[in-house]
């Protein structure tokens, strides 16, 4: 139920914004990011699909959880370099998902690493719904 409220809040935030979606490339928050990707997907985000996607290896060696943790509420460790990875869940890292440019770069790089392709808008929305619902 809390995730549904998060999704609805996110949609209201973007739909009532006086700025077009392209103007949201400034600093943002998790709710706005979810609304942007849900709108681009053209369908409601599903946090359960997002969790399954986040934890799956997709036929390769890594999953999102390989570096970000399972769940991604604490500090992770990059599977290849051993570098520290900040918590990804906005509830435990208020700076997470607060820059559209960084979110776009994060999805582009990590989807390519895990899937060997760009994530779809629906996959991004689902993952954001999952992350936003974590406490």
Each model region followed by its residue ranges:
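Short alpha-helix boundary/capping elements
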Residues: 58, 72, 132-135
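Post-cleavage N-terminal segment of exported redox proteins
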Residues: 1-47, 91-135
